Amino acid sequence: MIDKEKIIEGIKLFLEGIGEDITREGIKETPERVAKMWEEFEKERSFDFKLFEEYSNYSEMIIVKDIPFYSMCEHHLLPFFGKAHIAYIPNKKICGLSKLVRTVRAMALKPQVQERLTEEIADIVQKELEPMGVGVVIEAEHLCMSMRGVRSPGHCTVTSSLRGNFLSDIRTKEEFFKLIRQ
């Protein structure tokens, strides 16, 4: 659970630390806005991962691709954003497709690194569905690289996490990567 008062005080200190007048019209409500934003994020992080076991005969790959997301780099607290692709091969259970989208959003709404985000999504799908295999690919632009440091916008960082037959069967892996590129 988040501590709204700590967020408000922290943002006030941050703004003062960078030389802002926290009583200025455009900024005076910013600490409360930031705290409210994190409260909204916290609410979105929990959801029911609904399963449908009545479709137990379906055994081909299921993919939800181009799932948009926004996250926050834990190193610089700057956004990174992009799209995620999730696939799994059922083993007697399928989920509502929106649950895959919600999984991406829930895991992205916290300070994070893309590599861990990719792994966490794969871990949740694996845990909840116990499928034959899981594949997750994330493509993202990191503002910590675009706005600061190298200051080179437009780059795409790609991470992947594979489980089960996505890892052990080259044909499954190739099919997954081919389908997300279409």
Curated annotation (Swiss-Prot):
GO annotation terms (biological process): one-carbon metabolic process; tetrahydrobiopterin biosynthetic process; tetrahydrofolate biosynthetic process
Keyword annotations: GTP-binding, Hydrolase, Metal-binding, Nucleotide-binding, One-carbon metabolism, Zinc
Pathway(s) of this molecule: Cofactor biosynthesis; 7,8-dihydroneopterin triphosphate biosynthesis; 7,8-dihydroneopterin triphosphate from GTP: step 1/1
EC number per UniProt: 3.5.4.16
Lineage top rank: taxon: Bacteria
Gene Ontology molecular function terms on file: GTP binding; GTP cyclohydrolase I activity; zinc ion binding
One GO cellular component, as annotated: cytoplasm
Gene3D superfamilies: 1.10.286.10, 3.30.1130.10
NCBIfam families: folE (TIGR00063), PRK09347.1-2 (NF006825), PRK09347.1-3 (NF006826)
Protein name according to UniProt: GTP cyclohydrolase 1
Source organism of this protein record: Hydrogenobaculum sp. (strain Y04AAS1)
Organism lineage string: Bacteria, Pseudomonadati, Aquificota, Aquificia, Aquificales
